[in-house]
Amino acid sequence: VICLTGCSHVDKTDVQAVITNELDLLKNLDSDTTQKYVSYKELFPDATKEIKLSNEVKEVFSLFFQDFDYQILDLDVDEDKKEATASLRLSTIDAASLAKDYGEASLKNAILKAADSEEQATEKNTDSMEERYLLLDQLLSNNNYATVERECTVELCNKGSNDDKDEWEIIRSHSLENNLVGGLMTYLSDNNLLSPEETLTVYLNTLKTMNTEQMGNYLGIESLFNTSDTDKNSIAAALVELFHSTFDFNISSCDEESYNAVIQTKITTFD
């Protein structure tokens, strides 16, 4: 259903055609159109290293937009100013759930990366742009995310040189990019994406997966876990195995104040 109000039918038909042509390309998973409206740099502006558009990165956008759809709700065209505004209802992937899963997976990867090396340099432990997109690709490939709806406004301008030739173009903006990806940019940049309880849960669950060397590096007891002494290695391996078999936890409460949180947690481990 398309509601058209305000000006001549011809003008609105032209504007409607531009919107339809552009957004249909997104629906058809056109990679050039995807990059025109959603720059791969915008999702992760703080990434440590830029990348060329590999097939894996392009696949992320194909997976993201595979269920994309839209509906034009209203059009308003100002012929004198050569401006137009369209109200749209977008159907996108549940970006909030995707961002939450990404936050948890990214935190787990960061913990394991720190545990894989004795060096704690921030630059070495920060994911590159490619690593972040590969993680998104993994999540989109392995999970089925619901589709959600959101309404947004799209602005257009007429670049035509005279009255005989209309050249309507959609004005690209950060807001439009964010809406087309269901608000994913906003969710990923949210420092409170994971609650304190969720952050602690990821941390403690990740400890359960660490091998002997990782645990030694991460807990700062390399001298016990990383040694050439066969007997010490056997003891360290036995301790890690015992830890894995007995470790458990239960979060009972969380008190937050500003940027700090105190979490009451019952931890079970070996004696």
What is the predicted role of each segment?
Residues 1, 80, 205-206, 213, ...:
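Intrinsic disorder/low-complexity detector
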Residues 105-191:
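Short beta-strand edge/turn micro-motifs at domain boundaries
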Residues 55-142, 234-271:
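Surface-exposed, charged secondary-structure patches
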Residues 9-67, 71, 182-250:
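Core segments of small alpha/beta cavity-forming domains
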Residues 3-6:
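C-terminal motif of bacterial Sec signal peptides marking the signal peptidase cleavage site
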Residues 10, 163-165, 259:
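Intrinsic-disorder/low-complexity regions
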